[in-house]
Structures are given as C-alpha cells and as structure tokens.
C-alpha cells in the first residue's frame, strides 16, 4: 500500500482546480449568490497562523456554499498604502512601491499553497492606480454631494517626521517613530461628514442581528449618543465678543451644584487670552504637549488656569463661577466648555479639591443627611436618589428623571434647550504622507479650491521621490505640485495631502464586485453581489474600519455607486479568535528575559540542558520568538494539516493555542483517513445487515457537519468527522455501503481539508472533482431513530437502562426489564409489586 504524500498531491489538486476554473465567481441570475469576504491583509511580507485561521474559516464557508448550489464570490486583495512602506524606504532605501509589490508577491506565493478557493482574477491592491483613481472619482462625487469639506483642526504634529500623527501614534507625549515631543498644531484638513449620519448609524445597529453583540455595543459607545442641555452663561468682565459662554451638559440636574466653568485650551476664548497673556500662552503650550485623545487626557494630571473671568449662574445673577482653562476639556465634543459639579463627578471633585473650590451636593443616597464628601457621589442614572437642590423639588427620583425635569424646567425659564449630541466626530482624512491616495483637489488663486477634472484621473503618485529628509516628499517635488486649474486654465497647485488609509478599506468590498470596471462600481454587478453575506475579521476592527465602511456605503448610495439595499454592506460579521503559542525564555545575569524559538526547545530544555520558563497561550510576537511560520508547517505536514488544526481545537470565536503535538495529531488523523479510504477502495464484501446502520450514521454525519459549518461551529463539525471516521473504520457493512459512506466523508471534509478530500473522492470513484460536487443531503427518514433508551428505576432509584424498538409492546418491554441483571439483583428472587412502563420515557419497578 502506498503512503499519503501531501507535498505531491496538494499542488496537483490546486492545478486541477485552476485548470477547471472552479473558483471563478460567475454572475448567474438563475442561482442564489453568496459573497464571503475576509478582511484583506496589509502586505507585510509574511503570512502568519492568524492569516491561516482567518482565511481557512472563509474558505470553509465558501466551499460549502458553492457545493450547496450558490454562485460564490470569494475574492482577495491587499490593503497596501500606509506608513510602514515609507518607513522601510527611510530605513533601508528603495521605494515604497517596490517594497509593497514585492511583499504582495511573497504573500501571494505563501497563501496559494493553502488551497484557498479564491477567485484570484479579481485581485487588486489599494495602491494600484486603477483602484485609487476610482477612489478619487468618488471623493469628487462626495464633494459635490456635500459630504466632504475643509476646515482648520488641531492635530498631533511630529516636528521631526513633520507629519500629523493619529492619537494612537502618540506614546507618552512623543511620536511613536521619532521619539520627539509631539505638539498640537492647527492645520487645514479635509473631513468626511460622518457625524451627519451619527443617528442613523446608531439606530441601524439594531438591524444587524448577525453581528456580535459586543461589536454593536462598541460602535454604539463610540457614536456616543447623549441627551442634555445646551445653554449660555453670561460673562462678567469678558473681552469684547465673549459676553456669553455656551455650555453643553449631560447632567443639567447638577446645575445647582456648579462651582466652576472650564474651557478647552483650543476654545476661541482661550485662543484670545493666549494672544494677550504670556502666562495663559505658557499654560496652553503645556497643554498642547499632550496628545489630543481622550485616553491621553484621562491619563494626564488634571490642571487648570484661572483666567480671572467669571460667569453668572443662570438662576442667580449674584452667583459667580470662576472660568478655568483646563487640560482635560476636548474642543471637539459639545461646545468645548463645561461647568463643573464636584459633588457628582470624580474628575471635577479632584479638580475642585486641588484648587480649593466649593463642593455642593445636589442629591444624596436615599435616607442620608448632607455631610462633607470624601469623594464624588456618582450613582447610575437609573438609581433612585434624594434631590436636595433639584429642579422638581426635594424628592426621591432617578437620575434619568432628574435630568428630564431639569431640561423641562430650564426650557420653561428660557435657559437653553434640550439637545441630542453625539461623541462621533467628523472623519479627518488628511495625511502629510506620500504613500497614500492623493486627494484630487487643485488650489487656484482665482477659483479657490476645485476638484480635479475626472478625465484627468487618476492623479498618480510620482515615482521620482526621495525619503532622505523628513516630511512629505510631495511637498518638495520639483514638478508634481504644478498643474493647470481645470476650471479657468490658469497655473495652479495640487493638493499634497493624501487620504487616510482607512478610506481605502472602506469600500474595497464593493470594488470586488467589478474590479475592472471603468467606474467605482458596476450597477448590475453591485446589485447582484452586494451585500457581503459573511464578513470575517478581528475584533480590533470593531470600531474604525467597520464604522467607516458603514458610513462609506451610505455615501456611495447617495452618490449613485451602490444600491439602497447595500447601505449596511455586511449582513453577517464573525470575529475570530487569535492563534497563540507558548513563549520560551531564560534570563540573563541581570534578570532580563532572553527569548528562544520553539524549535530550539525540547522537553522544556535548550540543547545544552538549560531549563526554560514557559508562558502558555501568548499572542504570537516576533520579538518574543513564539511565531509559527505557516510555510514550515506546510512543508512538514501539508496545508490540510494546518487547516484542520486551526479549525478543530476550539470554537472559532476563541483563541486557539498552536502546539507541535496538536499539529502532529492532526496529521496522523488525516493519514488515517487516507489509509481507511485506500482500504475501503479495495474492499469487496457483500451487502449485509450492517449496511442500514452505516447509512443512518452517514445521514447523521451529513446533518451534524452541515449544521456545524453553517453555524460557524467548525470545531463541532470536525468532531463529528472524527466520530464518523471511527464509525466507518469499525463498521462491518458491505463494500458498496462503505464506499458510499467514504465518498460522503470526502464531501463533508472537503471544505476543511480539500486536497485530501479530492484524493479520497478520486480513490472511491467519485465523478469529477469533489470541489464541484453537490453538497450531500441527509435522507430525513434515516435521521429518525427507530429505537429508544429507557431508564429503569427500582423504588425510585436508577438501576440501569434498556434500549428497545420504539414500537415494542409494553408487555415485551416488561419481559426484557425483568430479565435485566440489575433488576434481578434488586428483586432478590421476589416478584415486583408493580412494573410500570411509560412509553418512550421510563420504566418504574416497585418492590
């Protein structure tokens, strides 16, 4: 008997699939469609086991749906713009384009041996001019639809790299790459009006029934709807033009406990004072050395600067509150100004304590008397409290009721109005980087800011750039910026900012429906293929990418690039767990960890016998040397082993730990399946009484594997295949029944281990390719059990069980029960007083 050789067979079947065009997506109105998509990768140059798990999940779904009769779209592309390519050019020389396309070629070569059912004819990279040119066309359409605008905004500026940094790229007040102290600078930036859709994006989350609840909650919190009061304090002794201070608060019920007002360092009043007061300027400069993110402000020490200005309480003109510039107030939320009620906000409490400000409780826990507070009393809004300075009298009510009463009272007195606000800000997309999609805008001295003419698209990035000095190479290119105004024909200047790379990934799913179209989408193809039926990716993309994609689909619908049904582009979302691995380390003389590769450790020791510390189930990390190279696994065991293991060990939403022993066990099982198929293919036994039992086991396997795959319980589907393998190997059924069952096994395991499935299918005489075979259907009659297992109780205690035909007469059941050894021991030779058979449920024996 020959041996199963994955290295020889896997490439052969991949060639057969390619030759037959098995995975080419076909627009077939006569068939239902199914669009499965995994979040496309950044071309870093190497795939990792997380990629293997992610793409195998999508592949299992795609293959099963194709077998079930769907016309399947399962594409692949590359999220290819971004800073890493520029950083590589700075550090190693060369060009970002060469680095990127080289990495794409490497990763494609690593992915293809996995045998994924991808339609590679639809492949594109977001750095392809053909792709970003269509993105530029949509940008122009969005400008014309009023979805794009330009304004001054405060940003994190790295003075060494000379670029804007995202909040996440500011670490301890310094640029993540340069290490230089970051400053806040005001720059003119381009924005998408995502905030116009805040309410719609929030409400529509309730329609996404096939999204994880955690993701929907994360998005809801990010959008951050709040109901509050917007009103104005009148100011005493204010500079000209600043006689009112507009404030937004979500807790107007605490207005009678106010002790100060505070404004953002970027508030117009703070800007005015900064220009006229050196002390204010110094304080504001200090504030701007902290990042602009809420997290950065939360971690920073809370500081304030007393401006000397005062505002009057709206219900008592004699009650004046000091106005501080505070480093924890965000300009882009609400109005950039707040009032502080220290008794009911811990941040305000610490601020008031630091600066000696009064602390006045507005409400107390039920049954408590007013006393000095050691900390802020901040109950849930749903909790009932006793208001002592409320707007609805001294009574007990919830915070929610108190807020509603405060808004109603203030509105009745002409003090402000109730408003709904959102935490979601407009999306700033300007980046002072080369390796991104150029913003297709022209600056003309006569016409102002105008979009590039569409016939001139794409606005291509110039190749002749250098990265030998910091900053954006487009700014210093000798000719690229120079252009002609498309409106008046005069000399003009091209926009040198490029788009945030999240723009690239916010519509790629739509481009896959017609990747070679001369417009961003093709209406007929988009109408057929959209929406994405199953989207798969990491939960780390729960907010930005997924929220931006939801916005972009709406923008594309408004500008005529997507049908109305596609404003929620992803029908179902699955967020998979990570692939983890043990970390192996020793320590140097100073106690610092020294990490070791898995292949250098045997039985917990290095080659020289030094024992290692083992940290279990850690995220794979190059620096900690616990990364498993999928190519090594494929060379050692074959792609099917890697696919089988990452699907089998745990539910797909949870992390799975990669172990060498687990991979070896998976490989052994697949070799066992091959040997079983080889044995059955040569069997010649006659049909017999066991054929029926095997047919029933096959039907159950079909039902349970189908349920597991369709329900994303891949580990349960694989567990059933293990069980079915055992059943088949033990079965004494005739040769034809076993061959029939083995062919079904090939079909059921084809989504997970497609190469081995083709081997088995061919061995057992299957017609054509199993990848093109219809998904098996279980005979409903074979799923009905014709036996039933009845527990036996003697005087109320369980003594055993008996399996009998469902239709067996009660008198016959009684005979079998009385013949049972456990019952006979309990009776001790005596006759029972009663023997009661409850059909289909239980047998009770009374002694």
Swiss-Prot record:
Keywords: Aminoacyl-tRNA synthetase, ATP-binding, Cytoplasm, Ligase, Nucleotide-binding, Protein biosynthesis. A motif ('KMSKS' region) lies at residues 619-623. GO terms for molecular function: aminoacyl-tRNA deacylase activity; ATP binding; leucine-tRNA ligase activity. It comes from the Bacteria. A motif ('HIGH' region) lies at residues 41-51. One of its GO terms (cellular component) is cytosol. It holds the Pfam family tRNA-synt_1. Its EC number is 6.1.1.4. The keyword ATP-binding applies. It is found in: Cytoplasm. NCBIfam families: leuS_bact. This is Leucine--tRNA ligase. It comes from Cereibacter sphaeroides (strain ATCC 17023 / DSM 158 / JCM 6121 / CCUG 31486 / LMG 2827 / NBRC 12203 / NCIMB 8253 / ATH 2.4.1.) (Rhodobacter sphaeroides). The lineage of its organism: Bacteria, Pseudomonadati, Pseudomonadota, Alphaproteobacteria, Rhodobacterales.
